[in-house]
């Protein structure tokens, strides 16, 4: 995993965004999250437990605790009540992106380089739209996958432009769990050190 953190990238735009009502919700929620030091990952309206508005978010350093979920919920609830974008009752669910997270920013591909991802594209690339493989390189315009399943006649590596991406998600592996836990522990230690330094000033 790359040593790159999400700190300082809070205004980095998302590559994969919502459409329709979900887009309207994201437009309402995202400025509130930025204002309190969080980044929006995804918003979805789901037909589960009645109707559920699922909001995935994280701190700029990539962490998200239960207390953070409560803070986000309390910050966005009043704004949603005022804007009233949903014409029926719904349940608000705020969560972290999880270990097998959606990949929505360029920095996600840098941060999780070396891990397995599955993705879909909006256009054909090497005669396909669905890919699965290890992120071997992430650049400014796209990323390179080393496919773990190659059909006859296909190249092992494929470069996917970020502009062609329609969906991407990490695949849960033991290595991913280990690296995600290590990154979370490091981010929490850095936050504790920063809080300690702030207290001494």
From Swiss-Prot:
Coiled-coil residues: none
Pfam family, any one: DUF150_C
Transmembrane residue ranges: none
Stored SUPFAM superfamilies: YhbC-like, C-terminal domain, YhbC-like, N-terminal domain
One BP annotation, GO: ribosomal small subunit assembly
Compartments in which it is found: Cytoplasm
Gene Ontology CC entries for this record: cytosol
Keywords: Cytoplasm, Ribosome biogenesis
Residues in the signal sequence: none
Record-stated family: Belongs to the RimP family.
Function: Required for maturation of 30S ribosomal subunits.
Name of the protein this chain belongs to: Ribosome maturation factor RimP
